Amino acid sequence: MKPWLEELVRALTTAEAELGPRAEQGTPAARAAGSARLAQARLRTASLLARGPIPASLRTGDRSDEAVAVYCEALADKARSLIERGEAALAACAPAAAASPRAWRAALCAP
C-alpha cells in the first residue's frame, strides 16, 4: 500500500473512532455536529480515493491498461462504500439537527 493511502486510511480510522461516539451521544446539537463531521470525513476521504494518484509501476509495461483498470476499480469500490457511509451519517444528522434549538444546524446535514 502506498504511503499516502496508508496515511489516508489511518486518518479516517482515527476520525471515525473519535467522531462515532459523538454522533451517537449527547445533546441533539452535539449529535448533529458529530454526525456532520463524520460524514465530512468519509466523503472527503472518498473524494481523495477517487482522485488518487495511479502508481507509476502500474502505468508502464505490457499489461498496464489492465493493471490501471483493476487498481482504479478497487479504489472506486472503496470510495463508493465511503460515500454510502457518509450519506448515512448525513441522514442520521438531520433528525438531531432538527431537534436542536438552533435552526442553522440543519445546514450541517445538507448533502
Language-model segments: residues:
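Acidic, polar-rich low-complexity tracts and alpha-helical solenoid repeat scaffolds
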Residues: 1-111
